[in-house]
Amino acid sequence: MRASRYLIATLKETPADAEVISHQLMLRAGMIRKLAAGLYTWLPLGLRVLKKVENIVREEMDRSGAQEVLMPAVQPAELWIESGRWEQYGGELLRIHDRHNRDFCVGPTHEEVITDLIRNELKSYKQLPANFYQIQMKFRDERRPRFGIMRAREFLMKDAYSFHVNQESLDETYMVMYDAYTRIFTRFGLDFRPVQADSGSIGGSSSHEFHVLANSGEDLIAFSTESDYAANLEKAEALTTLKQAPAPSKDMAKVATPGQRTIESVSEFLNLPAEQTVKTLLVLGEAEEGKPAPIIALVLRGDHVLNEIKAEKLPGVASPLTFASDEAIEAAVGCKPGSIGPVNLPLRTIVDNSAAVLANFVCGANEEGQHLTGVNWGRDCEIKETADLRNVVEGDLSPDGKGVLVLKKGIEVGHVFKLGDKYSSAMNATVLDENGKATVMQMGCYGIGVSRVVAAAIEQGHDDKGIIWPDALAPFEVALVPLNMHKSDVVREKAESLYAELLQAGVDVLLDDRNERPGVKFAEMELIGIPHRVVISDRGLAEGKVEYKGRRDTDSTDMTVDTVVNFIKEKLKK
């Protein structure tokens, strides 16, 4: 491609509404332009990257045995009503009416459509397993679209759905897709982690997320220093190093703590570390018909954070997790939040495993402005229920017994689920088994945010000059930059010759034949993030050399004209 005939729409200034670095650089590099909130036009440069991501995904999906289909973006409401999600999905589902006043939605996902298709097309267990995928624009009406492509309302996604006669078959395909995803993200050239995950609103049993590691990531993931264990913060199991609490060494005493309503202020007031305190959080339980919801107490170590996903899954706890109001707390306990503790608390109480091994701790006294010190389980307060209630922290033991956990930020770009019969049962998607009996199919669901991968790659790879692409995703692999080619026949002829050789070798090359100053060309190539740059000049050619510089390199290197093409091919493994 010749730069003189290509839309290079770079910007010198960063638009004011671009918050994260990927959004800033995609705008400045001329990859995208905003049309409306959460809606973007992909310019030629950005589309090249998007297509490279898409091509790798498609190649590996085909290799895995999945079959490509293309389903309508607009879906009839009847299917969503049948699955039960028409009302459940919430405001992100864009609902529309056609001219006949029939209800439709713009698809954020396609479980209903694919289930309807397969229940009409597949009739026998002999046709299973079957796996279908598409790469298609989706729409979710985000309340607050932000971060550019990272959280847009319209986005390109690869979604795949598999169908099975039994759980064993689903388990096999799940691992096939897990392995395919691992190959995909490896081919992208990104630093990523597959992690155990919660299935969330889509439902199902087993679930893994694929995260690109980046300091700007919104998600925290935990992984072991000595094994392959990895999980997102919602899912990671928190272990304690102690099996039981040490023996009491202090007497329980009540102390006045006027105005101290937080763990931080109580710790400072009593001059002790937060890990020697416990906090008691009150949430609503499941209500019986005609009765108010009961209140349940959750007790954690003062320095730990409640994991709301874990808490929500506790038997008897209302879903979604709802904290009790101050009025309900005062009515049930007799004091306001900030002075509540587990001693003589007239509520069902669940103690986190790490809090359950504390001794001589501090907690609220269930009296306004009062706390208890020297509290010990058993002697002062009975434990009836324990559970894993907290987020893991760095240094926790790895749940597989190998090493300790470290926490890093990640950007979720892929997700695989075992859906089971969540949709197939609701929509009566059955096949005849080997005995001629109708059996509900088991399903798997596998998604990759194709456009989100582009933003995640930038969040992981950039510097103060611009984007640093991995070779596999770069819009062009090589920038060929001739200096003064419009006045120098020697430079122009050698540039054209090298350009032709690189194209012949299958290299994705951009010839910067614009009549621009060298500094402008260099700055734009670095902003765009082309991994390899070759500069051709009169001075270099006089010595039979050109100048090479990798995007990650600090200094440039001179090499002979005759060797540069093979050097590039070797770099790119062509």
From Swiss-Prot:
UniProt keyword Ligase present: yes
GO cellular component terms attached to this protein's record: cytosol
UniProt-listed InterPro entries: aa-tRNA-synt_IIb (IPR002314), aa-tRNA-synth_II (IPR006195), aa-tRNA-synth_II/BPL/LPL (IPR045864), Anticodon-bd (IPR004154), Anticodon-bd_dom_sf (IPR036621), Pro-tRNA-ligase_IIa (IPR002316), Pro-tRNA-synth_IIa_bac-type (IPR004500), Pro-tRNA-Synthase_IIa_type1 (IPR023717)
Main subcellular localisation: cytoplasm
Molecular functions (GO terms): aminoacyl-tRNA deacylase activity; ATP binding; proline-tRNA ligase activity
Coiled coil start-end: none
Subcellular location, record wording: Cytoplasm
CDD domains in UniProt: ProRS-INS, ProRS_anticodon_short, ProRS_core_prok
EC number: 6.1.1.15
Protein keywords: Aminoacyl-tRNA synthetase, ATP-binding, Cytoplasm, Ligase, Nucleotide-binding, Protein biosynthesis
Reaction(s) catalysed (UniProt annotation): tRNA(Pro) + L-proline + ATP = L-prolyl-tRNA(Pro) + AMP + diphosphate
Membership in a protein family: Belongs to the class-II aminoacyl-tRNA synthetase family. ProS type 1 subfamily.
PANTHER family in the record: MITOCHONDRIAL RIBOSOME PROTEIN L39/PROLYL-TRNA LIGASE FAMILY MEMBER, PROLINE--TRNA LIGASE
Subunit structure of this chain's protein: Homodimer.
Protein's recorded name: Proline--tRNA ligase
Lineage: Bacteria, Pseudomonadati, Pseudomonadota, Gammaproteobacteria, Oceanospirillales
Gene name of the encoded protein: proS
